[in-house]
């Protein structure tokens, strides 16, 4: 009897999670009924999100019907929770409920949302439906619908959708064009290589960047000469071009136009010349670290905290929270700064960088703690007058919430609102999140590089959980294409900043403790 009891206990504790978490049809319907009964009564975001996430196990068509209403909720976090749950559903009947009405659906916002969540969930059945949606509704599709179709084909594979993707690369909305280029590159649709090459002349730099990346993935030999010529243009795209050229040729001359031009002109004329195979490229990539000193040589670069950039449109985001008033511990690293206070060290680095800027580099500065303060409303050129103004602003910066002057530690002004600072950098309202406009003239879209410096974890704001912040930044940067370099100073575990940099094409640097 005791042995039988032990066996039962072991089964309860160690049974597969899928068995334990499975719900019967009756349980699923009951969970949905209780959700619908109480959801409107809850006023707090946290309660609503928790209730939505509880429907993960209720993988049934009725749960889809209940969550459809939530997808229109005014709260961004609530809507995101509903998308997350829907993307996780796998039961055939549940998936069919989401797919069933897509072709004839009149609500463009709802259709685009279902396309998003189904593709996030890896539902290959969506591809057949997308063809029907396109054939029947092509002329009436909204910007958001076309954007989500392109993103879905990037996730699920664009093979067989060349005609649709080609049409999307010609859309008037730049977000749609770059999403289509991403899908072409990810799916390596070599039939469209010539069309992608033509996109190097797109008027929006983000679309040019997507075309450059796609050409690198397609390994289109005819793109080499035009890419080399584009190295003569100033700005951050030089780095993207150098990477694409490496992926096509397996050569590594960085942004050095003269070396690329000389080598390509000589070798491409040889009889029997060909670009390396994928296997040869993979081998070259493994050996690349040995030649990092050569990568990026040629051309003047600006540098902040040891991170170089060819960008001519830069934003510096600096933490001035209370903890920036602390002294560094490892003082041997900071002997040349005249002060061991963290903010003084950062101010010295930033001042040095600003002094080095030329009139062709446009820049701005944001200081943040609990709230965000911009030096200017827009990017300005590195002229003598603007640099003098910037240096004066830098000199005036002091940690907030330290008890000095009108600030006190108790007023909450010295906390770290990382999310608000990043949204200010993107020129977005934290409460609204990502909004597709199709407008490429917005001033924020001119920015292409951010240097983000902080000494602590997020402690206040709409989002403080690092996963939430990373998710929101990723959604925004799918169309912005801004490189985010991250710098930490002080006794701060930097895994968040490392990921923020890595996921956004940047470099992470730890200045020291």
Give the label of every model feature segment:
Residues 53-56, 87, 119, 154, ...:
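Structural signature of alpha-helical solenoid repeat scaffolds
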Residues 264-335, 373, 442:
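Acidic, polar low-complexity linker/tail segments
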Residues 312, 323-365, 379-386, 466-467:
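…and closely analogous acidic/polar surface helices at protein-protein or active-site interfaces
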Residues 51, 82, 114, 149, ...:
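Conserved hydrophobic register position within alpha-solenoid helical repeats
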Residues 437-448, 454-504, 509-511:
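VWA/integrin I-like adhesion module and closely mimicked acidic/polar interface patches used
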Residues 25-38, 60-72, 91-104, 123-137, ...:
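Amphipathic alpha-helical scaffolding segments comprising HEAT/armadillo-like alpha-solenoid repeats
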